[in-house]
Amino acid sequence: MASTSRDVIAGRGIHSKVKSAKLLEVLNAMEEEESNNNREEIFIAPPDNAAGEFTDEDSGDEDSQRGAHLPGSVLHASVLCEDSGTGEDNDDLELQPAKKRQKAVVKPQRIWTKRDIRPDFGSWTASDPHIEDLKSQELSPVGLFELFFDEGTINFIVNETNRYAWQKNVNLSLTAQELKCVLGILILSGYISYPRRRMFWETSPDSHHHLVADAIRRDRFELIFSYLHFADNNELDASDRFAKVRPLIIRMNCNFQKHAPLEEFYSFGESMCEYFGHRGSKQLHRGKPVRLGYKIWCGTTSRGYLVWFEPSQGTLFTKPDRSLDLGGSMVIKFVDALQERGFLPYHIFFDKVFTSVKLMSILRKKGVKATGTVREYRTERCPLKDPKELKKMKRGSFDYKVDESEEIIVCRWHDSSVVNICSNAVGIEPVRLTSRHSGAAKTRTQVHQPSLVKLYQEKVGGVGRMDQNIAKYKVKIRGMKWYSSFIGYVIDAALNNAWQLHRICCQDAQVDLLAFRRYIACVYLESNADTTSQGRRSRRLETESRFDMIGHWIIHQDKRTRCALCHSQTNTRCEKCQKGVHAKCFREYHIR
């Protein structure tokens, strides 16, 4: 536009210049310079009296090119004038590159048919030689617990704790025997607890515990517990919120999987480790027995043996699979850990937090069976009966559909409420009758139950059983560090696993969980006790130390005693066991 018209039409953009002005001003500016080559577009706003009853809109010739013919109301109307040409002022403007448009992922449309599922998985035929080997060893409770807190793990904790104390200019000199004593006190605190842990060492008759006081001094325990460490601070991963306990998690997962019973059915879910401090990874779960603490993803057997665990860090620190949410990605990690022992037709059960049709499809491709309750918006538009309609039908009614391409079934069942359940391995048939309490009739009635619902209810509770066992006698002693409660959780999980193996391997002489924990705590504390001024040692400690293959030496004794094995007179004894034993009987006496 000409310079005069530019004075009237100010304001510029990247591609055009727009300003509101009076029509008469614009026409006068255009008449002053006829040499303007830019194309002008003028938009005239309606006059002020456009809504009035009388207008002078017909007062001139419409074909005239001059503005004099226009009525006054139009000449004084506001206009928008746009210059579509290029001007000098556009040279300094930076053009923004166009954003790349992401291609939308087109999901395949599933075809749902009302029929029962036809799974193509093989049957379970695997045996477990490792459990048979454990049965033949007849391990004691301490031996079973030390399958997880083995010599390598104990020495690792000792080395890291001494390293951390040395970095703080403290000569701790922790030994493996002292660490086991500390573990014994932590285990004992699960079934004998005081408001203050120092009361274990008080001389007051109402609180003194001689087993703890004789095993280790109070200040020594406090010093060891305050410097307990599990990683080198100079090699921590900044992207891992649990970097200070990550080496322990890796070791425990390895031991848990190594000695896990090889079974067909597994359960996956969430567990909570109680914690009330200030930590970013702490979570709140309303309606849970443990509402506040660290959330831990857990994979267990149907009986409650913990096979694999991973503390939750959220999507910021844990990148989920692109096609799944965080929960589904954790299920895949658990399945990958299971398949390290072999690609077998495992059957995984989980609840609606994890289940989706997409997850069922991925697990099917991995050769893994899965069943779980599912939220309606994750069924990929499976055309089932409306829940309101199903509620009007009698209890036990159900509707179901199967995906034709991947043999995935979605069933909606009316029990006390309407529940959706999905599976890639179990179908509707056979439909069984189950007993339910009827509030209206005040009696129990028989309702129909599909096969996949029955199997789900029987096998899904593994994580809940583990939580129940841990909560009964969990470690009560806590420290100032944020991971002290997590360490207590790991110890409790190892005790639960050891007890589960005890129930499998020692079916003739089983003990309950409390007696199992007491046995381990007493052995660890008695083995570190100062026995110089005490009488004979307990029968329990003698049995454990006799077969540990550590520190047994044959020495001469002045007074002849009877051999503990052949019962004849001997002048030699075992230095550790303090039992008379012949040289020829020494080896046989110390082997089970």
From Swiss-Prot:
Family matches, as InterPro entries: PGBD, PiggyBac_TE-derived
Top-level taxon in the UniProt lineage: Eukaryota
An example Gene Ontology molecular-function term: sequence-specific DNA binding
Coiled-coil blocks: none
Region (Disordered), start-end ranges: 31-69
Pfam family, one: DDE_Tnp_1_7
Name of the protein: PiggyBac transposable element-derived protein 2
Organism: Homo sapiens (Human)
